[in-house]
Amino acid sequence: MRFLSTDMKDRNMLFAAIPSICASSPKKISIYNEEMIVARCFIGFLIFSRKSLGKTFKETLDGRIESIQEELLQFFNPNEVIPEESNEQQRLLRISLRICSTVVESLPTARCAPKCEKTVQALLCRNLNVKSATLLNATSSRRIRLQDDIVTGFHFSVSERFVSGSTFKASTIDLIREGLIVLRKVRVGGSI
């Protein structure tokens, strides 16, 4: 086995650590008890597996990052039904941004000062992004409110059916079926 310079340093560190762990008796005989052997093995393991452990941790973290990104993509479902008004508002914002950029290009000061043009465009883009984020937050809050209303309604209907003295008693299977129908409608984006 070939040792590189870093491997030699690691090996020298291991051999330097062994005497500091070993206890000597008065007769100059090394005493190796179980703790000493475990400590030596652990130090050797750390020194010689440092590179492979680093790669393992990096691969683990990279895998976790990928899974988090996949989970985030699931939240931004392209099949989600977005209200017509939000689509229309986004379209109008894009058009106004294009119009503003053409107006800025036609201004004589924009020809003289390209920095001004970039600043105005950056400001318009930032305003567009803020309005877009506000619109997405409003859409998201509407969806959350709808889900809360569905859950509340389902809880109310279940508790109403199991109240003592109620004349209408539904079986558990019927309740589960109703719940699944409601969930399917919510996932598809249909109305309830």
Swiss-Prot record:
Q: What's one GO BP annotation on this UniProt entry?
A: proton motive force-driven ATP synthesis
Extract the Pfam families matched here: Mt_ATP-synt_B
Question: What does the UniProt keyword field contain?
Answer: ATP synthesis, CF(0), Hydrogen ion transport, Ion transport, Membrane, Mitochondrion, Transmembrane, Transmembrane helix, Transport
Q: Report the GO molecular function annotations.
A: proton transmembrane transporter activity
Which superkingdom heads the taxonomic lineage of this protein's source?
Eukaryota
Record localization: Mitochondrion membrane
Q: Where are the transmembrane segments?
A: 29-49
Q: What membrane topology does the annotation report for this chain?
A: Single-pass membrane protein
Q: List the disulfide bonds.
A: none
Q: What is its main location?
A: mitochondrion
Question: Coiled-coil annotation: which residues?
Answer: none
Q: Please provide, in alphabetical order, the Gene Ontology terms of the cellular component aspect for this entry.
A: mitochondrial membrane; proton-transporting ATP synthase complex
Asked whether the UniProt record includes Metal-binding among its keywords, one would answer: no
Per UniProt, subunit arrangement is: F-type ATPases have 2 components, CF(1) - the catalytic core - and CF(0) - the membrane proton channel. CF(1) has five subunits: alpha(3), beta(3), gamma(1), delta(1), epsilon(1). CF(0) has three main subunits: a, b and c.
State the family it belongs to. Belongs to the ATPase protein MI25 family.
Q: What function does this protein fulfil?
A: This is one of the chains of the nonenzymatic component (CF(0) subunit) of the mitochondrial ATPase complex.
Q: What is this protein called?
A: ATP synthase protein MI25
Q: Which organism is it from?
A: Triticum aestivum
Q: What is the lineage of its organism?
A: Eukaryota, Viridiplantae, Streptophyta, Embryophyta, Tracheophyta
